[in-house]
Amino acid sequence: MKETFGEYIHKLRTEGALTLTKLAAALDIDQSTLSKIENGKRNIPEEILPKLANIFNLDIDQLEKEYFSEKIAEMIYPKENSSEFLKLAEQKAEYKKLTNLKQGKIDFKNA
């Protein structure tokens, strides 16, 4: 997706013929908040993603990828070497996965 997450929500809402009021009510947020999200003036709270996926019959994993990739992009786009930031972040994420995996195998009962 090359659009912002808010633009994506707007597209889903209009293609689904939902009004701001109806979608906001379904997400349990007020209409002005949803409008700000769609216009990029406010970020959508992460806890709303499962509701959004359910309403539009979307894969939650893909929706989370879009959501978090935008958050990362917002943090690094002003930097000149954004691709280097991404590479380093990916390496750190892999390290954290491996570290957590190793820690998960420790048998604390017999330690």
Regions of interest found by a model, annotated:
Residues 10, 21, 50:
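Residues within the helices of the helix-turn-helix
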Residues 13, 24, 53:
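The alpha-helix within a helix-turn-helix
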Residues 28, 45-62:
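DNA major-groove recognition helix of helix-turn-helix/homeodomain DNA-binding modules
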Residues 1-15:
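A short, Lys/Arg-rich alpha-helix, primarily the initiator
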Residues 64-107:
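Short, charged recognition helix plus adjacent turn
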Residues 17-35:
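Short alpha-helical DNA-recognition segment
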